[in-house]
């Protein structure tokens, strides 16, 4: 289902030449710098290459990160800092902040920022794959796994590398806790959407589907709350998406909970549960329109136009009609004024991030290679840093045209 997921733009970066004239005193260092330059260029190109798959991305990312490790950790002792950590200035934009970049003279900042973009690529790959016509079961599994991988990368950056930065992230920037938490939670929620779609397709028990939907809605609510203290100019569009998904999956939870109640001969409560689903579905429809009219980063998803979205509206209406008929002929139960409390706990299908680690240092980093970088020969004017306020050219992302909606239930 194309354009079902909201995606913020990729981070853009200034070119890095890895040219250290005068400092390089031997072929091993020269080769490493050449390899770094080509590996970085290749990885940046793959972010917008529609033919790129997870295997290609992993290989390219591992190559670059393994080479970059020599600028972060000392050769032969990963607990010691490399003498090269602070020799290069890196500039990266942020997903919500337009073209004005952040800049730090720190290889750890480069590792985190490029890793962040790799995670974003996995989310965009998942969205693109989910938008294919006639998506297969294996492709649905790949969507699910890609979102879990992305969550794992974001989580690893947050826990293991962002704390190492000497300059803390500014408020509203990608490496700030609120934003990276929102990305982690959104990835988990979207992966669970795939689980829900699968459970519906296989006609699992309504109680399980209701619990999964409720848990997913809670994820979206948590992500929205995480962003609530950000500047609305930057976060309003993203938050509208999170809010509409929260309403949509809460409606799903009430709909399937109503089916569970009806099966237990609690027809009056079932009607009230489905009335709540009907109200929340209408709210989600209204939020879809508001989301489409809200300005902000990223292309606009169009969830209300999808059969998966519309199917819920039909399901709620038909199930509510059935319950009302049954109550009029068989049960004659009073309909509660308050909607039932959803105290649902899913025991299956819950999504956890796939654990992630950066690759070990490249074998090209030997004591001889490190010694071939002579910092005493660093040019005196090398301390002149690029101005961080200079704009960085945005990434030109490919336009993903919506394909025919077949009603495939992989959301």
UniProtKB/Swiss-Prot annotation:
Modified residues (Cysteine methyl ester): 408
Membrane topology: Lipid-anchor
Entry comment on modification after translation: Farnesylation is required for nuclear envelope localization.
Family named by the database record: Belongs to the BROX family.
Organism: Mus musculus
Name used for this protein in its record: BRO1 domain-containing protein BROX
Biased composition (Basic and acidic residues): 375-404
GO cellular component terms given for this protein: nuclear envelope; nuclear membrane
Propeptide intervals in chain numbering: 409-411
Region of interest (Disordered), residue spans: 375-411
Annotated S-S bridges: none
Annotated Pfam families: BRO1
Keywords: Lipoprotein, Membrane, Methylation, Nucleus, Prenylation
Domain of life: Eukaryota
Cellular compartments annotated: Nucleus membrane
Subunit details: Monomer. Interacts with CHMP4B. Interacts with CHMP5: this interaction allows the recruitment of BROX to cellular membranes. Interacts with SYN2; this interaction promotes SYN2 ubiquitination and facilitates the relaxation of mechanical stress imposed by compressive actin fibers at the rupture site.
GO annotation (BP), single: mitotic nuclear membrane reassembly
Residues annotated as domain BRO1: 90-408
Protein purpose: Nuclear envelope-associated factor that is involved in the nuclear envelope ruptures during interphase (NERDI) repair, where it is locally recruited by CHMP5 and reduces cytoskeletal stress through its action on SYN2 to help reseal the ruptured membrane.
Lipidation (S-farnesyl cysteine): 408
InterPro entries assigned to the protein according to its UniProt record, in alphabetical order: BRO1_dom, BRO1_sf, BROX
